[in-house]
Amino acid sequence: MKKIYLCAISNIRSGACNEDCKFCTQSVKWGADINRYKQKDLKTIVNEAKLAKKNGATGFCLVTSGKGLDDKTLEYVCSAAKSVIKEVDISIIACNGTAGKDSLKELKKAGVKIYNHNLETSREYYPKICSTHTWDERFETCENIKSVGLQLCCGGIFGMGESNEDIESFIRSLKELKPNGIPLNFFIENEKLPLKATHNKDFALKTVKRFANEFKEAIIMLAGGREIVFGNEWTEALKVGANSIVIGDYLTTKGERPDRDLEILLNEGFEIANEC
């Protein structure tokens, strides 16, 4: 029986980003119609973590919009992590942009176990989707994460117009980093964003299978865009190699009801992992 790891995310600071990533509705440059706020109340975050745990999640990710982990953001994320840990037995993941070693060490002291920082795509293609920071900055952050002893979660977004060569280059870069977890996101179109999706179900299944074969020791997670690219047939991706899903809502888009996902997983004979 295949074990599936469930992860939930909390967008604790939304839409406050000055970067120009063409795939992201949280950039103020594109003016997407999303809910924007500076800080989510700590009590709300704890309650979301409790619900995630109740729904079977072993990981809970604290996400902030913005380029990187400045001092103010660091203090807030540490407070949120400590608040959750005090009341909920769940692994804390942080996703707060580019970060230096000292800041990452502080997160670790606060109880964060995993840091998520995606390369998004290949080094060659990245300048075509973002001009306000470099791919190399992202790669350096991933190296910093590993150097301080945090687990690294690092993946990308597919269907943004990248080529097969870009995907191969991206895989080579990930092999250098050896991440513990690899989230596979499939681009979600928005009328305000300048990109159009170039994926379909067959492409997505092929992508999942390729990453599962290349990274046999990593957790391969179906993340953003799962419902759009696979529809009701998303368990097919688990059968070709994925072993984790994000449950509940994403950063700025709605997800499937967690109880419905759980029902489908159990009905199809999957086991829910009880530790991250």
UniProtKB/Swiss-Prot annotation:
CDD domains listed in its UniProt record: Radical_SAM
Entry cofactors: [4Fe-4S] cluster; [2Fe-2S] cluster
Residues that bind [4Fe-4S] cluster: C17, C21, C24
EC number: 2.8.1.6
Catalytic activity: (4R,5S)-dethiobiotin + (sulfur carrier)-SH + 2 reduced [2Fe-2S]-[ferredoxin] + 2 S-adenosyl-L-methionine = (sulfur carrier)-H + biotin + 2 5'-deoxyadenosine + 2 L-methionine + 2 oxidized [2Fe-2S]-[ferredoxin]
Protein origin, superkingdom: Bacteria
Residues binding [2Fe-2S] cluster, per UniProt: C61, C95, C153
UniProt pathway: Cofactor biosynthesis; biotin biosynthesis; biotin from 7,8-diaminononanoate: step 2/2
Gene3D superfamilies hit by this protein: Aldolase class I
A biological process from GO: biotin biosynthetic process
Uppermost EC category: transferase
Keywords: 2Fe-2S, 4Fe-4S, Biotin biosynthesis, Iron, Iron-sulfur, Metal-binding, S-adenosyl-L-methionine, Transferase
Subunit record text: Homodimer.
PANTHER family registered for this protein in UniProt: BIOTIN SYNTHASE, BIOTIN SYNTHASE, MITOCHONDRIAL
Family: Belongs to the radical SAM superfamily. Biotin synthase family.
NCBIfam families cross-referenced by the UniProt entry: bioB (TIGR00433), PRK08508.1 (NF006308)
Function in brief: Catalyzes the conversion of dethiobiotin (DTB) to biotin by the insertion of a sulfur atom into dethiobiotin via a radical-based mechanism.
Protein name according to UniProt: Biotin synthase
Classification of source organism: Bacteria, Pseudomonadati, Campylobacterota, Epsilonproteobacteria, Nautiliales
Name of encoding gene: bioB
